[in-house]
Regions:
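TRNA-recognition modules of translation machinery and tRNA-sensing kinases, especially anticodon-binding
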Residues: 27, 130-429
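N-terminal alpha-helical targeting/anchoring segments
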Residues: 1-134, 149, 153
């Protein structure tokens, strides 16, 4: 959410930003909120003047009563009563205007960083860098569910009977591999100085609207019936929410947390072969990282965060690349974002496995996350990044570590979490 003072002083910058994000339908909102803001300030000035006059008249009434000027006092009493009624009317209007302003301001997108490429959607994202050499083996790589089934490692049919499409039972070595990746990612981030945390898996609506747009909320979140609670779609929401309505000191910054949680999402995406299996599902687990920091440090942390994900994947022998998200692919609160994509030898292309975002002070403004500085208070900056989401990680891991005999090699870093095993073997049927 933008600072209303910034919008008031820089309407053309805000409008150009909206155009850069290809959201021209929101352009009229800028002028609308400026008019509402003007009316809001007029109301406050009128109320202030009326209260001052009311207070002055009240003192005069007391003096008149003492001097037995009862008729004059009655005239002033009537005037005070009229002022009180007008103040009440204006207070009602003020509340309505402020609600309208807040609603519009929650819709206007955050100002993107000047370095963000201008583009309409994810097809115009820009490749930044590749890490590791993509390899296509001289044998056929099966679809990921077929690889899992060879280890008796997934049961989609039973999950469909129990919960419907978009769920799975992971079994045996595949389930163990899933847990191994999560445990390794946890320790990886702890070793990089992050504090480990398991957050609430449900959050209230004021936290939801503090961390994302209404459109994102509607597309992602499951609401608990009869409760002001939503199942989290990612633990970053719960983790950022931890700081709601808090004032931190500069000495307490940065806050660097890594969190584990199950995640629940309504979204399914477009149908197609890559939508089968575990690529896009309703329930999955994830290791996340968030940072709350000073504004001047947020871009430095942004670089550190996505590099953590790259380093994690490379430690498991998985080639990756980074993509700079273009303006039209950025969610409304984001200032800058980079996707990390893993190499798929089966598809002979990269696919998304994580995303790192700098949200500037947008979430902090919505949630009231302030910092007490030497020269006054200011809003913190917040960032988030996927450490690893095992469903997609498993796809990349299995494809890149599959051997010609059907076994899967376990990289050295994962072996302590897999009982020391160097590979997992195909199960005999």
């Amino acid at each position: 959410m933008l600072d209303i003072k910034f919008l008031r002083s820089n309407p053309e910058i805000v409008k150009q930003n909206i155009k850069n994000k290809f959201q021209d339908e929101k352009l009229p909102l800028v002028d609308e909120v400026i008019e509402l803001d003007l009316r809001n300030r007029e109301i406050k000035q009128e109320v202030e003047a009326l209260r001052a006059e009311k207070n002055k008249s009240s003192k005069e009434i007391g003096a008149m009563m003492a001097q037995k000027k009862f008729e004059e006092a009655e005239v002033l009493k009537k005037k005070v009563s009229e002022s009180a009624g007008r103040i009440e009317e204006l207070s009602v209007e003020e509340k309505e205007v402020e609600e309208k302003i807040k609603k519009i301001m929650m819709t206007i997108p955050n100002i993107i960083d000047p370095s963000v490429p201008i583009g309409k959607d994810d097809s115009e994202n820009v490749e930044l860098e590749r890490f590791g050499e993509p390899v296509v083996p001289d044998f056929e790589i099966p679809y990921h569910t077929e690889i899992m089934e060879a280890f008796n490692g997934i049961d989609l049919d039973s999950a469909r009977k129990v919960a419907g499409n978009g769920f799975d039972y992971l079994m045996g070595d595949i389930a163990r591999l899933h847990s191994a990746v999560i445990s390794y990612a946890r320790d990886f981030m702890i070793n990089r100085g992050f504090t480990y945390c398991i957050p609430p898996f449900m959050i209230r609506s004021n936290v939801v609207t503090g961390v994302m747009s209404f459109a994102e909320m509607d597309a992602m979140m499951y609401k608990i019936e009869g409760e002001d609670l939503y199942l989290i779609g990612t633990s970053e929401h719960s983790m950022i929410g931890k700081f709601i309505n808090t004032q931190l000191t500069e000495e307490e910054l940065p806050q660097t947390l890594t969190s584990y949680s199950p995640c629940f999402r309504k979204e399914k995406g477009a149908h197609g072969i890559e939508e089968r299996g575990v690529y896009r599902i309703h329930q999955f687990e994830k290791q996340e990282m968030i940072v709350v920091c000073k504004p001047e440090e947020s871009m430095e942390w942004y670089e550190k965060l996505w590099k953590n994900t790259v380093d994690l994947f490379r430690s498991m022998d998985i080639p990756v690349r980074t993509l700079e998200c273009c303006s039209g692919d950025l969610a409304d609160l984001k200032v800058k974002s980079v996707d990390v994509e893993a190499w798929s030898p089966r598809q002979k292309k990269y696919f998304e496995v994580g995303s790192c975002s700098n949200l500037g002070d947008a979430q902090a403004r919505r949630l009231g996350i302030r910092v007490k500085g030497k020269d006054g208070n200011y809003f913190a900056h917040t960032l988030n990044n996927t450490v690893v989401a095992p469903p997609r990680m498993l796809i990349a891991f299995l494809e890149n570590n599959l051997q010609a005999d059907g076994s899967v090699k376990i990289p050295e870093v994962l072996r302590p979490y897999m009982g020391g095993n160097e590979k997992i073997e195909v199960k005999k049927k």
